[in-house]
Amino acid sequence: MHERVYEVAGDSHNAAGVDLDSCNTWGTGFDALCGVWRDPDFDARQPSFYYARVIENPTCRWSQKLCIANHIRCNGQAPVPDGFEPCCAENHVRTLQERAWSSPIWYTPNL
C-alpha cells in the first residue's frame, strides 16, 4: 500500500504569514472548505483508505505572544528580564500551523 496526497480545496501556496513583532497575520484563508474528489488511481481489487488533512495558516505560538506582551526585544540593546531568556533563544519556535485529520474511510474489496 502506498500513500499519496492530493490538494482538493484551499490553496497551500497562499503566501500567508505572521508578523513576529505583532503576531498580526496576513494572507488569505477560508471560513469553510468543500470539495469533491475521485481517486484517479482507484483499483476495486485493492484495499485502500482515505482521510482529510487540514493545515491552518501560520499563527504565533503562545510563547511568542507572551514575549510580545512583555515587550521583550532580542536586539541586545536592553537586558532580557529573568525568565524571558527563551524568547531570544535560537531554538525558540515562534509560529505554528495547527493540523487536523479526519477519521479514515476504509475500502476493502470483496474477495
What positions do the PLM features span?
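C-terminal functional module detector
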Residues: 1-111
